[in-house]
């Protein structure tokens, strides 16, 4: 595998309908890309996902490798993929998504020419038919090596779809993604960033992110059932954030990232109180005041319209044993929920 440069890890659970499209997008006019290693991690799937993946492995053994394992959720697939990856760089591709073949080739060319810790690329949001709805880019010079401080303004809008890491950096910090829960992709764009000293942005679309599919973890019904998973992830991010020195150049990125994510979680909870069990949020919020006072204070400054909604929620719920859910049912007070 000496000519290979990039390992793509594909966590896969019951994706028989879309896995073929995903794997096809990694081929060049139907032929294997010799610079790629593709690890398809079958996470205890009960449909034909494994059969489909093994079919590609049989046809293109030089790039596709299938790993069947018991179900352990998303993070366990990332951990397995990282352990097995043999190439200099690593990228995650979800089985219901795909890549832009032209953009992928440009990314590979850049990986072969530059030596850096992180490569950021554009990604597009697509509907289930594959039509591009929008494209996400970064307001920073392309084809230029930047230092880690330049990540600061990008923190609030970072997504796992945009990142490609140097593999050895993640192993050096013994990176381990939380297993058994959803939404751990947030961890992938947090602690690994502490290993970045230089990065390059390539304003080419590589990743095609499918939205609007029934059963996605970002579906509001799925999120309502699993919001405690988000809180577990946020607690993990808080531990990393608290350990980083404020003078570190990466601190600004982590601050922007965790503040945006925390605001998103609190907003979803407090504007969907009829669907949510608030007990986990109350426990987390009480712990947060001592775990990370700066984040606790920041959340208290958030406004919806003219209402400091988190501050009021804390005041009414904690001190009067009385919720203020009615404040959050009026659309004029709804905040701008960040994606």
Place the predicted regions along the sequence by residue.
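Membrane-interface aromatic/basic loop that binds lipid-linked glycans or pyrophosphate carriers
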Residues: 271-339
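Acidic helix N-cap motif at the loop->helix transition within catalytic regions
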Residues: 20, 47-56, 68, 98, ...
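Short, acidic, metal-binding catalytic loop of nucleotide-sugar glycosyltransferases
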Residues: 24-35
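Short aromatic/hydrophobic "clamp" motif used to bind/position activated sugar donors
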Residues: 90
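Donor-binding/catalytic cores of nucleotide-activated saccharide
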Residues: 74, 78, 95-200, 209-224
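Short beta-strand/loop segment that forms part of the nucleotide-sugar
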Residues: 35-45, 65-70, 95
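A conserved acidic beta->alpha catalytic loop
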Residues: 25, 42-51
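Glycine-rich, basic loop-to-helix element that forms the pyrophosphate-binding segment
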Residues: 69-85
């Amino acid at each position: 595998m000496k000519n290979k440069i990039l390992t793509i890890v594909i966590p896969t659970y019951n994706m028989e309908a879309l896995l073929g499209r995903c794997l096809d997008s990694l081929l060049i006019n139907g032929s294997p890309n010799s610079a790629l290693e593709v690890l398809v991690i079958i996470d205890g799937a009960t449909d034909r996902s494994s059969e489909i993946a093994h079919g590609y492995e049989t046809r293109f053994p030089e790039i596709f490798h299938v790993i069947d394992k018991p179900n352990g959720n998303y993070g366990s697939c990332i951990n397995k993929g990282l352990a097995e990856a043999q190439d200099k760089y690593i990228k995650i591709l979800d089985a219901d998504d795909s890549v832009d073949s032209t953009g992928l080739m440009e990314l590979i060319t850049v990986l072969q020419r530059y030596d850096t810790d992180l490569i950021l690329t554009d990604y597009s949001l697509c509907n289930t038919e594959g039509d591009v709805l929008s494209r996400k880019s970064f307001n920073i010079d392309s084809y230029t090596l930047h230092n880690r401080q330049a990540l600061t303004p990008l923190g609030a809008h970072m997504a796992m779809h945009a990142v490609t890491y140097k593999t050895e950096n993640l192993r050096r910090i013994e990176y381990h993604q939380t297993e058994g829960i959803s939404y751990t992709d947030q961890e992938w764009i947090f602690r690994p960033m502490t290993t970045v000293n230089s990065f390059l942005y390539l304003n080419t679309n590589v990743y095609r992110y499918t939205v609007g599919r029934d059963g996605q973890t970002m579906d509001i019904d799925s999120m309502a059932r699993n919001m405690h998973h988000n809180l577990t992830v946020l607690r993990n991010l808080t531990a990393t954030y608290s350990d980083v020195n404020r003078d570190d150049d990466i601190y600004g990125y982590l601050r922007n990232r965790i503040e945006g994510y925390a605001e998103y979680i609190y907003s979803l909870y407090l504007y969907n109180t009829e669907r949510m069990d608030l007990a986990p949020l109350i426990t987390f919020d009480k712990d947060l005041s001592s775990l990370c006072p700066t984040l606790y204070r920041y959340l208290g400054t958030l406004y919806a319209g003219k209402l400091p909604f988190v501050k009021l929620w804390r005041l009414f719920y904690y001190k009067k044993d009385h919720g203020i859910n009615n404040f959050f049912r009026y659309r004029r007070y709804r905040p701008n929920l960040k994606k």
